[in-house]
Amino acid sequence: MNKSVGFILLLLMFTNTMNAELANGKIEEFFIKNGIEERKIRIYYPNNNSVDDDTTFIIMNDGEELFLERDSWRGRTWRIDKSFDGLAKINKDPNVIIIAVQSAKKYKGKFFDNTRRYLELFPKEVIEFLPEGNKKKIYGSLADTDYPKFLVESVVPFVEGKFEINLDKNNLGIIGSSMGGLSALNTIIEYPDEFGFAGCLSTHWIGIKPWEYLLLPIRQRISGDQ
């Protein structure tokens, strides 16, 4: 059997098994070239939704943390399929499609390296403002990937081609947590015409002292907060 055909069959079997374990909806898996690597992308259809002109697409960072617990290094995930299942039980059916992008920490799907994830999601524009020293040199030498650019130039065109649609700020958003939340904010700042909203949960605010986290809830809100 041709190796490519065998791989595709194996991927289909795995995806079917995964879908059987979801509380709601279905998933399709794809791999997109990212430099010398391939990045796993999962397209999640809540309630098996079809796509139309009113569908909102949401890119979610750290795709391995969104569904089944076995995909996560810590054995706990968001289980967004259960959240959508809860909405379905109260007759709520959001017209959305989730684009789950696997993080760089799951290197080649074999082991976890959180340093790679941190460096990829770290806003590269900040490096030039760091004080001169070892930290600036290390970040400058290792932070060689541009995650927002990868999303806009690789992931978004792939999704547009698959669904034969145009994505922009009117139908595309991005969500992440911790460093993924910081990256989501950075992405919408860099590409305001591409993304219409960003969800930043438990954001990892780099550059502040640990005790300053305690003051964040009572500080002045960012313009636009409700």
What residue spans do the PLM features occupy?
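Sec/Tat signal peptide C-region and signal peptidase I cleavage site
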Residues: 16-20
